[in-house]
């Protein structure tokens, strides 16, 4: 197994009546190159997704599949702001 050196983090807020639907979809979703994933509940309907990847290249290869997945769950999410839309994503190399 390749040592993980890249991660992505996505903050989002679910609509109260869509929480179960979201987790049904996310639990069926798999991205090649993603070694592990975590979802933290950070508020009543607020969540933070963390994906651990083999490399920056691995996430780049999966980008179109990730956008398709977001399109599938977008309706389950509340807008965070007009500037951000429904997600607040960041990614980068794991340094510690």
Which role fits each region the language model picked out?
Residues 1-68, 75-96:
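Short S/T/G/P-rich N-terminal loop/turn motif that feeds into the first structured element of a domain
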